[in-house]
Amino acid sequence: MRDSTPLIHPTAVIDPSATLADDVRVGAFSLIGADVQIGAGTEVGPHCSIHGPTRIGRNNRFIGHAAIGGEPQDKKYAGERTELVIGDGNVIREFVTINRGTGGGGGVTVVGNDNWMLAYTHVAHDCHVGNHCVFSNNTTLAGHVTVGDYVIISGFAGAHQFCRIGAHAFLGMGALTNGDVPPFTMVGSDSLGRPRGINSEGLKRRGFDAERITAIKRAYRTLYVAGLPLADAKLQLAEQAKSSEDVRGMLEFIEAAERPLLR
């Protein structure tokens, strides 16, 4: 039986300059502004607003009341052209806000593919979010935060501006981090954001075998348990990286740090 629901609800407002694929659905009272592109298979629920310049890929779902592509919340923003780019297969839940970039921060906010952003998540200007991440309710990313692939952020957790969160990391409920979180690391459920071991369960679910997880745990102990100065820990990690691609990735992440490392 063919679905008789209209693709564009009669109460929706679509700017003439917006470009929507033929099968995009837009719900009641939603607004699609100027210079917005939305790819095939995407659904925009009721009461959403999407402002441009924004590029949205295929098969995304905006459940309702999401505010996407709004101006950056930065007093230095002076109306320069900046944009938001969202990939494919993302689920954006109720009251999520994702802002465009700033001229001083690269000009673009990026969200990758297959992410879940639950209610009241905020992704600020110039953030770069990878693929396959889960942001639980009230996750807050300040400006310029970079999040790697397969990161899980629990409810009411957040990251300070310019922080990086490495791939496969896990932030516990209410965790706040003002330093870079290395790949694979768990951050405790407290306001101080202390490291609490390796996200072993998540790695197992993603197909990491025992040998890889053992190497990652050894690297974590070198960095956080052995009591070494960071310079000495990096020397040991460099040796371990010779036999582990995962440790090599951790070391490269640490070497690229511009903010203090979560310690």
Curated annotation (Swiss-Prot):
What the entry lists under InterPro entries is as follows: Acetyltransf_C (IPR029098), Acetyltransf_C_sf (IPR037157), Hexapep (IPR001451), Lipid_A_LpxA (IPR010137), Trimer_LpxA-like_sf (IPR011004)
Q: Which Pfam families match?
A: Acetyltransf_11, Hexapep
Which pathway does it serve?
A: Glycolipid biosynthesis; lipid IV(A) biosynthesis; lipid IV(A) from (3R)-3-hydroxytetradecanoyl-[acyl-carrier-protein] and UDP-N-acetyl-alpha-D-glucosamine: step 1/6
Ordered alphabetically, the record's keywords are:
Acyltransferase, Cytoplasm, Lipid A biosynthesis, Lipid biosynthesis, Lipid metabolism, Repeat, Transferase
Please tell me one Gene Ontology term that the record gives under cellular component.
cytoplasm
- CDD domains found in the cross-reference section: LbH_UDP-GlcNAc_AT (cd03351)
List GO BP terms, alphabetically: lipid A biosynthetic process
Q: What is its main location?
A: cytoplasm
Question: What is known about what this protein does?
Answer: Involved in the biosynthesis of lipid A, a phosphorylated glycolipid that anchors the lipopolysaccharide to the outer membrane of the cell.
Q: Belongs to which family?
A: Belongs to the transferase hexapeptide repeat family. LpxA subfamily.
What name is this protein filed under? Acyl-[acyl-carrier-protein]--UDP-N-acetylglucosamine O-acyltransferase
Gene name for this UniProt entry: lpxA
